[in-house]
A protein has these predicted regions:
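Glycine-rich phosphate-binding/hydrolytic loop that grips phosphoryl groups
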Residues: 160-163, 352-391
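DPxDG-like acidic metal-binding loop motif
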Residues: 130-147
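Conserved phosphate-binding catalytic cores of ATP/NTP-utilizing and phosphoryl-transfer enzymes
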Residues: 154-182, 367
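Conserved phosphate-binding/catalytic loops in two-lobed NTP-binding clefts
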Residues: 153-154, 322, 338-364
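A short helix-loop
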Residues: 5-9, 16-33, 175-180, 185-187, ...
Length: 393
């Protein structure tokens, strides 16, 4: 089986083509993996601007699909002139009536190449930015209609869980088998969640942020320190520098650990963001050393809270496995802290490869293959759902 995956939930246009390998577990080879990031375009806004994201997805997606097909040796150009039949053209026009730029590009693609040997399409249906999600969904629906290929909608957060479980050996990816129940910590720019997993594909959110997501808090704190977007890597870079030089944080720059002792599994990071602002304003101007102090204290505060909540969740759900996913899971200090926690408490830890931490098509492809392996039915009608919970997938 060959599957094409589409991911457009935020500011990365990602296309992957994978080929399933025989075996009991979900195992596959990656034939192509394309990612086009919009980070440079969104820097001026200090965050992702939804309609700009939609526009850039629309401009890029058809060409990226063609490039992925070519890299996977699945693109065969037509030798004879071909025109889309009138009835099918009308359906395509109706499907992409709100995406005229994509419509023109798709017509060129369909009339210029033969139908590729693709057996299924997986596409992110949510959560995420709905204008961006619609671009990927409409592209998937157009491909499915023109080439008569079934479509499997994927929950983006389940994709991050599956990414955490992926192992790679001899260029073959496999969804690792592990002991359940498990707990997943999903940390990104839009989500901070603790998910109980009695078994794979059965999810219950047991804790989440009441305000800012952890990645959002990193970005906002970075802006207060006049650091470039995206702020998370910049905060981490300064924090690591501070650790290496043994920098001691000034007492008046110490930060709170919000909801550390709340007794529940929920999070709140808006107070931490406000605390950073208060300390910056109190100093008036801050030098580079003070920036490193605040970055160090901020990263430590976030990590302390995450570790405490994970430890409590593991105990309450009696989990034997911790899975970490989402863009913030690439943070070196958080990874190190979770590794130490797992070793102390005696549970298994799964973290994604760094290239699978941020949004990508491989995690959507793997999740789509998992759905197919469990005989989940494809869908004909898809709707972008910006708030689709992993519980409902």
């Amino acid at each position: 089986m060959i599957l094409l995956a589409i991911e457009t939930s935020c500011d990365e246009t990602a296309i992957s083509i994978v080929k399933r390998v025989r075996g009991k577990q979900v195992r596959f080879e990656v034939l192509s993996n394309k990612i086009l990031s919009q980070i440079d375009l969104h820097t001026q806004y200090g965050g992702v601007f939804p309609m700009l994201a939609k526009r850039e997805h629309t401009k890029a997606i058809t060409q990226l699909i063609a490039e992925a097909l070519g890299e996977a040796d699945l693109l065969v150009e037509r030798t004879n002139s071909y025109h889309i039949p009138s009835a099918l053209r009308k359906k395509l026009d109706a499907q992409l009536m709100r995406e005229p730029e994509m419509l023109s590009a798709m017509k060129v693609l369909f009339e210029g190449i033969q139908k590729p040997t693709i057996d299924a399409i997986a596409v992110t249906e949510g959560p995420g930015l709905e204008p961006a999600l619609w671009v990927g969904i409409n592209a998937a629906l157009a491909l499915g209609m023109m080439w008569d290929i079934p479509i499997y909608p994927v929950n983006h957060m389940e994709g991050h869980i599956v990414a955490g479980l992926l192992s790679i050996e001899n260029d073959v990816y496999e969804i690792s088998d592990t002991d359940y129940p498990a707990t997943a910590l999903l940390i990104s720019g839009g989500h901070t969640e603790l998910v109980n997993i009695p078994k794979l594909r059965s999810y219950s959110v047991v804790g989440k942020t009441r305000d800012d997501a952890v990645g959002e808090a990193f970005d906002k704190a970075a802006r207060m320190l006049l650091l470039p977007y995206p702020g998370g890597p910049e905060i981490s870079r300064l924090a690591e520098h501070a650790r290496k030089e043994g920098l001691v944080v000034d007492e008046d720059l110490r930060l709170p650990r919000p909801m550390l002792h709340s007794g529940d599994l929920h999070f709140s990071f808006s107070g931490l963001k406000t605390a950073v602002l208060t300390r910056v304003k109190k100093r008036g101007t801050i030098n580079e050393e003070e920036k490193r102090m605040i970055a160090l204290e901020f990263e430590n505060a976030v990590t302390d809270v995450l570790v405490a909540k994970v430890k409590q969740a593991m105990y309450e759900t009696r989990s034997s496995t911790l899975i970490i996913g989402g863009g913030v899971s690439a943070n070196t200090h958080i990874r190190f802290a979770m590794k130490n926690l797992a070793e102390r408490e005696g549970f298994s830890l799964f973290v994604p490869n760094r290239n699978l931490s941020t949004d990508n098509g491989i995690m959507i492809a793997a999740t789509g293959l998992l759905h197919i392996a469990e005989d989940k039915k494809p869908k004909v009608k898809l709707v972008a759902n910006g708030s689709w919970s992993v519980e409902g997938c």
